[in-house]
Design a protein with these regions (language model features):
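ABC ATP-binding cassette signature C-motif
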Residues: 1-212
């Protein structure tokens, strides 16, 4: 039986720091296989609601329940990873278990640069095993498909390329390529067509229509 994903928002209320009510008694459910667009004027609270669903913000009332893995594309995909590489961008939208395993591998590699004794080597071997168990090698295969589709370059050749060398559309296309191919059952995409050109918007529409 394949995992299912859903999001249930019940009676959510959110107040701004000055006391103004931004969201009040917001309720809806997104069931398995549904594709839903959240439409509203600038400042209506769309991004705030998405941040409540992800757990970044806590509502003043109401509840959020969800099931399945959650993949998130924020409005600014490079926020928090400025000066980073294509590898860092793809890793930032990977499942938490993969991110944790990658951090452990990086820490062990740094430790080996300082002290290459048997104990450190054993820790590195364990970290690589955890990376494999987390699906790290499999996800690198997916990343290769994504970089080829978005940039026409293999992951091995592009992973250390700085994000500043990519356009905003290329950055978004990379993230979308991964999330739409990735393992998560629930995707939250905040203004996904921003920076995409007309062919990119057409591609996104087709991919969303094709997705389960």
């Amino acid at each position: 039986m394949h995992p299912v994903g859903h999001v249930d928002i019940a009676g959510v209320r959110y107040e701004l720091p000055d006391g103004r009510v931004l969201l009040d008694d917001v309720s809806f459910r997104v069931g398995e296989g549904a594709k839903v667009a959240l439409v509203g004027a600038n400042g209506a609270g769309k991004t705030t609601l998405l941040r409540i669903i992800t757990g970044d913000l806590v509502p003043h009332a109401g509840a959020i329940t969800r099931s399945g893995g959650l993949g998130v594309m924020r409005q600014m995909v490079t926020h928090g990873i400025e000066g980073a590489t294509i590898h860092d961008l793809l890793l930032s939208v990977a499942p938490q278990r993969v991110r944790d395993a990658a951090a452990h591998v990086d820490a062990c590699e740094l430790a080996m640069m300082e002290n290459d004794d048997e104990k450190t080597q054993m820790r590195y071997a364990v970290a690589l095993s955890e990376w494999a168990d987390a699906g790290g090698y499999d996800i690198e295969v997916t990343w290769d498909v994504c970089t080829m589709a978005a940039l026409g370059i293999s992951y091995d050749r592009s992973k250390y390329r700085e994000l500043t060398t990519l356009s905003g559309g290329e950055q978004k296309r990379l993230v979308l390529e991964f999330l739409l191919r990735g393992p998560d059952e629930v995707l939250l995409l905040d203004e996904p067509d921003n920076f995409l050109d007309v062919p990119g918007k057409t591609w996104l529409e087709e991919r969303i229509n094709e997705s389960a």
